[in-house]
Amino acid sequence: ELEQIREGARHHIATYATIPSLYRDGMTDRDLQIEIEREMRRRGSIGIFRCFGSAMEIYMGSLLTGDNAGAPSPYDFALGGAGSQALPLGSNGTPLREGQAVMIDMAGNYGVYCTDMTRTYSIGRLSDEAYRLHELSLEIHRQVMQKAAPGTSCADLYNESLRIVEEAGAGPYFMGTELQAQFVGHGLGLQINELPVLMGRSKDTLQPGMIIAFEPKFVLPHIGAVGIENTYLVTETGIENLTPAPEEIIDLTQR
């Protein structure tokens, strides 16, 4: 099972490496997402993922830019997006404009098991605050995942993330603006969002062999979302990153 997850992660990383080459001037968020979905299918993605607890299968992930990154959604994901009437989640036809962030959170469903990875891109240069918050997301990964090991409380990981965010004065932007998600990670496997949930009310602890996604993200009005998400394996002694793709913000106009 673990080797299938590792193989899926390798395909996931390879797909993300092609994203700058898929961008064209004048695209909307949906245009770019369609090109990414095509590339994922070419590499063996099954094209859908299953969601825990909601008896549903939906398309391959979301792409958020500009104010749509802060749009609330009825679905229990880290960020929402207006989407469409058929599925109020994710891209909604927003033009990709200069100075906006492009957050890509597409599921690595290349077989039976899922991997989950988010990376942030830009159309030209972003504000200094956007780069600061993106670096803060990376710092949260470094600090919090150092504490992750068998027996670690999921609530402690969430609360440690909040502590770092509050010390940086970034609370109003963390995990949304109008509607802020009350978790910072989740398990995954056959479904994209399984137990445990990294949230303040969780009673769960990490156990060897668990696969978790960790996704501290920030939303800036008019700019979009920044931050990353990685999939981690809980080992006997700590944590292993299964999605070690480049983590910096990549300017799509400089491809």
How should these model regions be labeled?
Residues 1-255:
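Active-site neighborhoods and metal-handling regions in enzymes and metal-associated proteins
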